[in-house]
Structures are given as C-alpha cells and as structure tokens.
C-alpha cells in the first residue's frame, strides 16, 4: 500500500485486527485518534501515520496497553485519556506497571487531566483548527469512584479483576468531529471499551437531553451544538393613536368628549381605589398591554362617577330602549318587577269560589310613583261557585303594592258516602238541604273587602287527613239485615269441647274378629302377620305317642298325622359370637369386612415411614451440595420444612388414600398393588384397569425408573409423543436446578431497555477481552434497534446463529429504512458465512450489509524498511 494512501483527506476509520484483540484508528482529515490497542509493545500500523493526536483507553487492560507504551517510547508527546488515580505501587510485569508508566509520561504534558464525568456534559476539546474542524470528547460515565476501583484492580495485579472492573466501571464517551465546512455532516463515535450493555444504556439515557446531536439521524456541522428551538414568542405590535392606553396624569392634556347617554342602565363596576372627581376620563378604548407589562388594578377597573357627569362607553350586548330624559318621572317599581311577580299559581282543578275582583286602591308609595291599574277580570255567576280560603292567606297579603294575582283553591278530596243510621240522641242537629243552600245569601265577590265580611269562614278541610272514627249508635228495633256480623279469626284455635277425646279410629267396643279365647282352645297362626290369628273351636289336647303309632295324635278318639319336627314346641336357635347361626350358610356382613380392611395399619405406617425416609434422603443430598452460606441456610430450612410436612396428619392421610385407591388385599389385588409399588409386575395375574391417569405410575418410585402398565397402547403412544415433544423443547435449555434467590441476595438482572433510539456513525457491540460478543440475542437485538449506527464493529468470534438473527431483527425495527447499516465482523466462521448466504434478500430489503471480516482483509504498507502486511479494514465515514 503506498504511503499517500495513509494520508487521506477524508474522514475514515481503520479497524485493526489481531489474534488477541482489535483496535480502531480514526482519521479525521489528518487528525488521528487511537481507540484501544494491542498487548504487544509494537506500534504496528500506527507507526505509518504522521502523528497521533490522542489515545483513548476506556478499558486499561493488559491487551490494550502495549501499543500505547510503544508509542510513548518514541519520545513524542502523546496525550493519553484514561480514568485512573495516581499509583503508589504496582506489581511487576502486570498491567498496573504499564499503566503506571503511562501515567508518569502523561503527567509531563501540560493541561492533560483524566476525563471525569460531569452532569453538565462539558466538551473536552482534543483538537481544534479553523481550516479542518473541531474534535471534542464528551464523557458519559466514569467518575472518581470508578477511577478508584480500576486503580485498585490494576495495583493488585489480578488481570481477571482488572477485566471485571473495566466492564463495570469503564469510561463511556462520545467522540464528536465537526468539520470546518458548515454544510458537512458531523461524525459521532461511541467509545465504550469493554463496558456492559446495562452501563451503556444508563449512560445514553441520562445524556439524551444534554446531547441533542444524538437524537437525529443526520446533523450538519453548524447545527451540532444548537438546542431545540423554543416556540417563538409574538412581539407586541406598535400601538396606533386610537389604541394607546389611557393616561393617568393629573392634568388633562386634551378636552374630554361629550358624554354619550347610555342605551341602558347597566350595573356599574366598582373599584377599590377612590376616584378623584376632578380627574378626567378618556372615552377611547385602551390597547392591550404588552406581555411583559403587568397592568395595575386601578387602570383596569372602571372608576365610579355619576351617570350624568362621566358616563363611559361600554359595549352593549343587545339593543334596548333609549333612556328617558331627566325631567321624566321614573317608572314605578311595580312595572319593573312585572317580570318577577311575588307568587304565581297554576290551576290544577275546578275552582271553588268566585273570580277575584279588582283589588282595592292602595295608598301610593311616593308622590313620584303610582301603581298602574290592573285589568279587571270578568265577573262570573256567583250562584255556581263558592269561595274557600286557606289560612295561609291574610288580608295584609293583598295590600302590598304588587301586581294582582290569581287565587287558586284546590278542592279537598270528597269523602265516600256513608250509610249511617239516624242518630236519635241528637235531635237538635239539622241537615242542610240543597234548597237551603241555594237560598243562602250571596258571598262577597270582592276580594279587597274580605276584611268587612262578618260571616264565619269555615276552616279548610285537609284532604289528606284520615277521618276520625265515630262510635256506632245502638239502635233498638232494627232489622236483622242491618246487623253486621263480627269478623272471625281464621287462625284462632277453637275452644275445647266435649268431643275432643273422640277418636274415630278407636273402636268403642271389642272387635268381632278377636273374641275372648277360652283357656282350653287352640290358637292357629295365619301366614300373613297382618291378619288376626284363627281360634279353633276345639280345645287343645297335648299330643302323646301311643306305641308303634309314633307321630299320631288322637283327638276325640281319632288318629291325626303330625308333620315331622312339630311334635314338640319349636325352640329358636341361639346365634354364635360372630352373629351367624351354626347350621345356616349366611354370608359375613359388610360391616365385618370393612372392619377387617382397617387391619392393614401396619402396612400404611411402613409406607409412610418409607416416604419420610425418601424426603430425608433428598434433604441430605441437598445439604451435601457445594453451596454458599446463604443458599445452604435456605436449603437447610427448606429440607426441615419438608420433613415436618411429611409427618403431618393431612400428608399421612393423603398417602394412605393414594395407596388404598390402587387396590387392597381384601379385594384380591393387594399382591398386584404391592408388586407395582416395588417396581415389578406379576404376569400371571392381570392387573385390573383402574382410572388410567390414577395408577399409571407407582406411588413411591424409590429412585428407580417409573414402571408403566402395558394395558393401554393408545395411552402409551400419547405419552411417548408428549415426551418426544418435550425433549425437543428442552433441547436448548440446560438441565440445571433453578433455586429461588436466597433471602438477602441480589435479584436477577432485568432485561435492558433503552428509553429512545440514538444515532451514531461508528459503534462497537459490547464485547469481552476474548473478542466475543458479551450480550445474548435479546440484548443484542435491543442494542441494534436503539443504538442506530451506520457502521457497527462486531466481535464475531464464536458467534451464534441467534445473535446474527438478532442483528437482522434489530435492523428491521428502524423507522428510516433508507438509513444504511454496515456490519464489520472481526472474525470469520461457517455460521457467519451460512447466515450471509441465506439472508441476502433480507439484507437488501432492510438496507443492511455485512462486509468481509477483518481477519480476511490484508493490507500491505511499503516503506524504507520494506513491505509489511497488516490485517485491517478501511471504512469511509463521510
């Protein structure tokens, strides 16, 4: 490769490959920045560049410090940015010794301090030129505490601890290159070293608001540091002469316009400040005050003044009648209150009473006001109506200078007619007939003269009041039809009578079928027990055998044949101890059989003891595991709890019921059930088919293989198919015992989720010192989908197919499909080659590209020392 190829005038990146590590050399128009390095103390490809402006060591591990140490030995000043504290001692031959030497060389350079995190995210200027541009470094993570942890690990000399400290406390930064030309795009590089994915996510989410150039896909050089434009505030327009605010000076500078009479009499606004009578008031509308000026209360509120002297021009919402002249008398108050009468009632029924007549003339309230006469209502015929007044109306209610109103009286609810007997005890009370009512004097129809009426007004009748009961008079000589029978209580028990002891089913005389039997007669029992016995008409004669004619009974000199066995009275046979008869083939009762089933308590106790032994053995095995102190304590408590639960009455009863359900010796299958529990099968006797899922496996397996019954081939096929499917599902999962977290231990890490997408030009996938991607497929998909970069450096050593597929799935989530993405793998593998061949169409559809791995790209550099070949990949950034 010719030397002029190295001196490029275009921003690019050289991805340097090696057997143990990778590094990145950035070329920003001749400004070189080295990110990382190699373990060998050899500058390598960096020796062919002109000058290195700075070295960034985000993870100061042993695999990164060799190149930096070789560059410092050349004697040129080289700023090295790493987050470490001053070393006191370092172990010889360790990474701490090299870091201490780098720190001593760096201390001789002016104004080179270790970059530390600042919540304000200031820009650390690395290079600045008016002809080329500005190179800045923003620190997102890495403070004093992180520096102490890394320094302690380096001083200890344990490289494993150094790598762990670099992953958890390493420096994370953003490198920003702003070209001198304002219309060119900036270059954004994520510097993460070997930091974990969670640390990267937390750092970016915190810096999202302070670094606005990370929130858009493309940023110009002039807009890189500009904030989001705030909403424009409208400026106040220059006021016109008619829109100037009212003056508040003491002397009037211009004459006051004549007052315009108000169209109506609106309610005057009051002001807390006293208004001066000599201060003039302008009639022009005030212009709205600017936003910055705060108007005072005195200028906003209208000042009180007499309506005849200084009326103000106010907008009237609706046109109304003009105001009356000054000499005209004011309208009466009754007319102004016409729209609001004192009371109004609506007629809801027939009116009982005369129509209200015109009111009496009332005294005027004042000389200036006089009530207008109300229209007189038409007179009605007084013969058909009556007036019934309520107590709530008084004569004073009609002398209140208000408008006349209609009096509506609601008639009471008529009571139902009663059929009462004429009372003879009160002859002085007379009944008013309809004719007397018609001859009654006419009622006064003038409501105003009600006070002069001397007639007594009957009190109003409450229609909702329940009438009081009146005692019914006792009228002698009435007919039987007028008598009302007293109500009869249907639930009252009647009084006892003489016939209460009468029982219709109890005979009062002896039954004819049960006569008195003489002592010398025979009673013959009938076959039916419900029928009465039959009494023979002959007396009983005890049988007596006579010589050879045994079995013959002579009754009244006649011989009768007696059946065998009935020569003597029948004596019942006594039962045995078990409740059965001696000469009877009676089966043993079921109750006795159940009592015999409970005799196997010894076997149940043995099975229970065996189960407890199994639990004890399991707890002992768990205690023998090599666990830490907290987990061992947790397992010990769990095993003790299992042993206690196994001895509970509920557990023993459950085990007994399971054993009994599989069969017992009383049913003839005890031997088969016992053989099935011990793992053996008796082929001579067929095991009955119980519930298929109840007795498929043994109750206690004793650590041996489970023995299944071979009586249902169809069910065996189903179980085998399920087992095969479960093996396929669990093939990718290791057979590890997942114990719950011990009390006090750290909870499992939650999946990493970025708050929003971020845009870069170069990023490196989180990796470890072995050049392997340190995140799983889910984390890699989240990283690619949210950290959207044009160029992605992928540590592809021993990468899996799931991780490669996660990169493709993450790229598919980008909203801007035209935004390209170039993946630069560091190592080649058959998995990577096969993935590239199978997904060529998907790459083209999603604008994704996989370049040739770095280890497959060779570049030769010719110099005076000769030609040297390097593993590197060059990628343009602009």
Curated annotation (Swiss-Prot):
Cellular localisation: Cell projection, Dendrite; Perikaryon; Cell projection, Axon; Cytoplasm, Cytoskeleton
Compositional bias segments (type: Basic and acidic residues): 416-425, 480-496
Keywords: Cell projection, Cytoplasm, Cytoskeleton
GO biological process annotation, one example: microtubule cytoskeleton organization
Spans through the membrane: none
UniProt biased composition (Low complexity): 241-268, 278-293, 310-321, 328-339
Disulphide-bonded residues: none
Keyword presence, tRNA processing: no
Keyword Cytoplasm: yes
Region annotated Disordered, chain positions: 224-425, 456-518
InterPro entries: MAP1
A GO molecular function held by the record: actin binding
Assigned GO CC terms: axon; cytosol; dendrite; microtubule; microtubule associated complex; microtubule cytoskeleton; neuronal cell body; perikaryon
PANTHER family linked: ATPASE F1_V1_A1 COMPLEX ALPHA_BETA SUBUNIT NUCLEOTIDE-BINDING DOMAIN-CONTAINING PROTEIN (PTHR13843:SF12), MICROTUBULE-ASSOCIATED PROTEIN (PTHR13843)
Oligomer status and interactors: Interacts with dlg-1.
Similarity comment text for this entry: Belongs to the MAP1A/MAP1B/MAP1S family.
Protein name per Swiss-Prot or TrEMBL: Microtubule-associated protein homolog maph-1.1
Lineage: Eukaryota, Metazoa, Ecdysozoa, Nematoda, Chromadorea
Gene of this entry: maph-1.1
């Amino acid at each position: 490769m010719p030397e002029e190829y190295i001196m490029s005038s275009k921003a690019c990146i050289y991805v340097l490959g090696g057997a143990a590590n990778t590094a990145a050399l950035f070329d920003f128009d001749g400004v070189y920045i080295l990110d990382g390095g190699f373990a060998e103390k050899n500058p390598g490809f960096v020796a062919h560049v002109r000058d290195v402006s700075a070295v960034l060591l985000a993870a100061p591990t042993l695999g990164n410090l060799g190149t930096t140490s070789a560059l410092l030995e050349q004697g040129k000043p080289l700023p090295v940015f790493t987050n470490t504290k001053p070393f006191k001692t370092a172990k010889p031959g360790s990474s701490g010794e090299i870091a201490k030497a780098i720190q001593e060389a760096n201390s001789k350079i002016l104004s080179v301090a270790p970059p530390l995190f600042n919540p304000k995210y200031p820009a650390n200027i690395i290079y600045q030129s008016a002809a080329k541009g500005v190179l800045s470094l923003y620190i997102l993570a890495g403070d004093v505490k992180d520096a102490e942890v890394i320094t302690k690990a380096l001083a200890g000399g344990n490289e494993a601890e150094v790598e762990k400290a670099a992953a958890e406390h390493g420096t994370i930064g953003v490198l920003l290159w702003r070209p001198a030309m304002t219309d060119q795009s900036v270059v954004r590089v994520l510097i993460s070293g070997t930091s974990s994915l969670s640390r990267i996510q937390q750092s970016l989410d915190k810096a999202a608001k302070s670094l606005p150039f990370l929130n858009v896909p493309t940023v110009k050089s002039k807009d890189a540091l500009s904030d989001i434009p705030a909403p424009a505030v409208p400026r106040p327009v220059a006021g016109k002469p008619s829109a100037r605010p009212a003056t508040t000076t003491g002397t009037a500078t211009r004459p006051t316009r004549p007052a315009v009479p108000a169209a109506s009499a609106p309610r005057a606004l009051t002001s807390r400040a006293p208004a001066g009578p000599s201060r003039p008031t302008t009639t022009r509308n005030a212009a709205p005050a600017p936003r910055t000026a705060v108007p005072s209360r005195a200028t906003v509120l209208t000042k009180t003044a007499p309506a005849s002297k200084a009326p103000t021009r106010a907008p009237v919402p609706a046109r109304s009648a003009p105001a009356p002249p000054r000499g005209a008398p004011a309208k009466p108050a009754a007319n102004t209150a016409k729209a609001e009468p004192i009371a109004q009632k609506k007629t809801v029924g027939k009116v009982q009473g005369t129509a209200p007549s015109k009111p009496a003339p009332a005294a005027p309230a004042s000389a200036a006001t006089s009530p207008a006469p109300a229209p007189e209502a038409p007179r009605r015929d007084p013969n058909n109506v009556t007036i019934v007044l309520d107590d709530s109306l008084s004569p004073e209610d009609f002398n209140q200078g208000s408008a006349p109103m209609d009096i509506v009286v609601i008639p009471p609810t008529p009571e139902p007619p009663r059929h009462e007997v004429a009372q003879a005890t009160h002859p002085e009370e007379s009944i008013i007939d309809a004719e007397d009512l018609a001859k009654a004097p006419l009622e006064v129809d003038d409501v105003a003269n009600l006070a002069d009426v001397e007639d007594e007004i009957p009190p109003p009748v409450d229609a909702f009041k329940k009438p009081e009961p009146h005692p019914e008079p006792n009228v002698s000589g009435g007919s039987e039809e007028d008598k009302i029978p007293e109500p009869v209580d249907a639930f009252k028990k009647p009084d006892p009578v003489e016939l209460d002891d009468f029982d219709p089913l109890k005979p009062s005389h002896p039954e004819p079928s049960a006569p008195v039997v003489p002592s010398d007669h025979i009673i013959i029992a009938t076959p039916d027990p419900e029928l009465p016995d039959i009494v023979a008409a002959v007396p009983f004669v005890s049988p007596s055998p006579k010589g050879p004619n045994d079995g013959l009974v002579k009754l009244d000199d006649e011989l009768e044949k007696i059946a065998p066995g009935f020569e003597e009275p029948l004596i019942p046979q006594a039962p045995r101890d078990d409740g059965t008869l001696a000469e009877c083939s009676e089966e043993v009762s079921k109750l006795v059989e159940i009592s015999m089933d409970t005799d196997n308590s010894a076997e149940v106790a043995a099975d229970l003891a065996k189960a407890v032994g199994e639990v004890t053995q399991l707890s002992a095995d768990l205690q023998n595991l090599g666990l830490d102190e907290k987990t061992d304590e947790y397992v010990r408590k769990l095993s003790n709890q299992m042993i206690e639960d196994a001895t509970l009455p509920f557990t023993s009863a459950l085990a007994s019921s399971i054993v009994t359900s599989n069969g017992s010796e009383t049913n003839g299958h005890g031997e088969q059930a016992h053989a099935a529990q011990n793992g053996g099968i008796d082929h001579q006797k067929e095991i009955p088919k119980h519930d298929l899922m109840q007795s498929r496996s043994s109750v206690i397996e004793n650590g041996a293989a489970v023995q299944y019954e071979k009586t249902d081939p169809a069910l065996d096929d189903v179980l085998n198919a399920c087992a095969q499917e479960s093996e396929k599902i669990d093939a990718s999962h290791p057979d590890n015992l997942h114990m719950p977290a011990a009390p006090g231990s750290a909870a499992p890490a939650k999946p990493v989720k970025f708050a929003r997408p971020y845009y870069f030009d170069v990023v490196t996938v989180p990796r470890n010192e072995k050049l392997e991607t340190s995140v799983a497929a889910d984390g890699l998909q989240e990283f690619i989908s949210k950290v959207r970069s044009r160029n992605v450096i992928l540590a592809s050593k021993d990468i899996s197919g799931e991780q490669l597929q996660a990169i493709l799935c993450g790229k598919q989530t980008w909203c801007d499909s035209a935004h390209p993405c170039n993946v630069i793998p560091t190592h080649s593998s058959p998995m990577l080659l096969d993935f590239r061949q199978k997904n060529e169409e998907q790459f083209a559809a999603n604008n994704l590209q996989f370049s040739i791995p770095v280890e497959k790209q060779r570049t030769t550099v010719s110099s005076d020392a000769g030609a040297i070949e390097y593993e590197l990949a060059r990628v343009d950034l602009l």
